[in-house]
Amino acid sequence: MTFSVAIALLKDWSRMHYIQGMHPNVAKWIEIDRRLNETAPQKSEAWLKLRHGMLTASDAATALGCNKYEKPFDLLLKKCNLAPKFTGNDATRHGEKYEDEARIKFEQIHPELGKVWEFGVCQHPEYPFLGGSPDGVTEESNSLVEIKCPMMRDIGDGEVPEHYMPQVNSFFSFFLFVS
């Protein structure tokens, strides 16, 4: 059994990317997530509070200086509660609007991976200040799914924009430590 990350970069449904690799033992995380989802389902206030205290996979590109939309110092201010609360913008609202549709489309294009279940927060087992929330985990193949729905950019086949790679690599780090 392999473990992998699937990235659904959706402007055009036909362009989805599947990255192979990863550790086969995800059952432990799925069980932890089931318990967490009872108290902190994704996008809930409890989920936001858990994530706020962590440097998350979504923050990785900013922390490394690779995010053209946010500077590392702004991330520091945000984590210290010294920045205005981000309430979304057109791009994030667009992504949230189409995320469920993208998940369903991904399942249709990759039936061999099974159903994609939403996933809550996973905390790094060795460094609890690190965490992340993949957009889903597949039922049959124990693959993580990260969905991106860009508004205006055309994405070529096999192309994952560089600024998404720190987020994906963070997920690799978290799940390679599962025992």
Model-derived features: positions:
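Charged, glycine-rich intrinsically disordered N-terminal tails and low-complexity linkers that flank
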Residues: 1-97, 101, 109
